Amino acid sequence: MATPANQTGRITQVIGAVVDVQFEGHLPAILNAIETKNGDNRLVLEVAQHLGESTVRTIAMDTTEGLVRGQEVTDTGNPIMVPVGVGTLGRIMNVIGEPVDEQGPVANEGLRPIHAEAPTYTDQSTEAEILVTGIKVVDLLAPYAKGGKIGLFGGAGVGKTVLIQELINNVAKAHGGYSVFAGVGERTREGNDLYHEFIESGVNKKGGGEGSKCALVYGQMNEPPGARARVALSGLTVAEHFRDQGQDVLFFVDNIFRFTQAGSEVSALLGRIPSAVGYQPTLATDMGALQERITTTHKGSITSVQAIYVPADDLTDPAPATSFAHLDATTVLNRAISEKGIYPAVDPLDSTSRMLSPLIVGEEHYQTARMVQQVLQKYKSLQDIIAILGMDELSEEDKLAVARARKIERFLSQPFFVAEIFTGSPGKFVDLADTIKGFRAICEGKYDHLPEAAFYMVGAIEEAVEKGKKLAAEAA
């Protein structure tokens, strides 16, 4: 809600990221941005509470060191406004829309408030269409919906960020679509690496502009909780503008857990009583306000991929558990799989998607996915017997199932474009038809004669056959 702008108030109290401001006249509305100078920097405060008749409690979007009591503050009359449009592509902005990549001001098509209503039911589109990513394990077993929400679950260091980079790269190449990346409370080093990798891989041009495909909005680990709690909304606002222009946008959030974590810090600073495991009492409301805006309308779509850190690998923790309710597909990364050297370390039995239905993906795709899961599940149930008694005690049928399962496990790995510099093997984009054909053939036993090493880190099944011949020649 807009209020009369340019009213001035004075700071009465500063406690960390919380600043109390006293106004003589009309109080600024909740969620309004109010501004002050802190040294040479413009400091934005967001109104969070009204205390009594003349004081508001605000959350700072930057550090508050250097603020003094009695300092003058101006009400902008609006929520935080960020630049939107093609000019944001290839640029890095912070939570309040200021460029932080030292490439000059951001050319924009106007400013939009970061707080907005979700699209109404009549505006939303309900068509079900699959988004092909070129990553075999994803496309086959847990396909992504165009305009859907996807959760990437995994503990620390199992490859969430690399998978996100590969998705941005593949979607930019295959679909030519724009992406928006919101870095929420993650490592500054990773943010910097991502920016440079995008330039090196041709996703973005240095300094932005023509040829760039991805806008970056960062609020990193070292920022105050106010910035981390709002930066996802700033990124979403940029994505919403592209959607309203008729684009199919990809919106990446790394990491949605830090959004919850920052909300919990802000909540504690505002003196609210915590709920389960010390999280904010408004956890579900905060999550809903963000997630309900990520949707497909009749104009365009926002497909969102959210990395979700799982504290102590516990999926029942309130933060990941609240995210689950909003998702169309889950891609679960498993440490046990990454320890085998299989990347992407996606768990083929734990990952789910509402798109995996014969009515949406077709009968052949559905049956192949189920066959693959059946073989892998059988292998999983035999693992105890193998560990205790060894392979020799299995029946011939079970031995065959285990051999096929191990081939499938290895065939679910594939070299990534963004990891070429580390692995030395060129990345592979595998078409959906090739993926289905390859896995179906393995399940039907057409490649029982090939060694399992032939299936490791290849693209389509033809490459596995070539690799098998090469291995046989070397062995001879």
Swiss-Prot record:
UniProt keyword annotations, A-Z: ATP synthesis, ATP-binding, Cell inner membrane, Cell membrane, CF(1), Hydrogen ion transport, Ion transport, Membrane, Nucleotide-binding, Translocase, Transport
GO cellular component: plasma membrane; proton-transporting ATP synthase complex
PANTHER family linked: ATP SYNTHASE, ATP SYNTHASE SUBUNIT BETA, MITOCHONDRIAL
GO molecular function: ATP binding; ATP hydrolysis activity; proton-transporting ATP synthase activity, rotational mechanism
Residues given in the record as ATP binding sites: G154, G155, A156, G157, V158, G159, K160, T161
SMART domains linked to this entry: AAA
PROSITE patterns: ATPASE_ALPHA_BETA (PS00152)
UniProt cross-references to Pfam families, sorted A to Z: ATP-synt_ab, ATP-synt_ab_N, ATP-synt_VA_C
Membrane topology (UniProt): Peripheral membrane protein
Assembly and binders: F-type ATPases have 2 components, CF(1) - the catalytic core - and CF(0) - the membrane proton channel. CF(1) has five subunits: alpha(3), beta(3), gamma(1), delta(1), epsilon(1). CF(0) has four main subunits: a(1), b(1), b'(1) and c(9-12).
Protein location: Cell inner membrane
Alphabetical list of InterPro entries matching this protein: AAA+_ATPase (IPR003593), ATP-synt_VA_C (IPR055190), ATP_synth_F1_bsu (IPR005722), ATPase_a/bsu_AS (IPR020003), ATPase_alpha/beta_chains (IPR050053), ATPase_F1/V1/A1_a/bsu_N (IPR004100), ATPase_F1/V1/A1_a/bsu_N_sf (IPR036121), ATPase_F1/V1/A1_a/bsu_nucl-bd (IPR000194)
Enzyme Commission number(s): 7.1.2.2
Functional description taken from the UniProt entry: Produces ATP from ADP in the presence of a proton gradient across the membrane. The catalytic sites are hosted primarily by the beta subunits.
Catalyzed reaction equations: ATP + H2O + 4 H(+)(in) = ADP + phosphate + 5 H(+)(out)
Chief subcellular location: membrane
Enzyme class: translocase
Domain of life (superkingdom): Bacteria
Family that this chain belongs to: Belongs to the ATPase alpha/beta chains family.
Protein name, UniProt field: ATP synthase subunit beta
